């Protein structure tokens, strides 16, 4: 989860659409179940929100 927070935090500074990160997480963690996907998406979003608020 901490890696997802960090990935989310750098995402505003990369030339990659945020949706691409979300899509990749769904593909990578999808077979582990929806709970795992949701947990990682929430961590990704938390990192993004933090970075955008603290630029």
Language-model segments: residues:
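Aromatic-enriched
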Residues: 1-4, 11-55
């Amino acid at each position: 989860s901490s890696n997802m927070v960090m990935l989310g935090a750098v995402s505003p500074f990369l030339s990659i659409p945020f949706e691409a990160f979300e899509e990749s997480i769904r593909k990578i963690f999808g077979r582990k179940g929806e709970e795992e996907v949701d947990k990682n998406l929430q961590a990704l979003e938390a990192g993004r929100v933090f970075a955008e608020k603290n630029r």
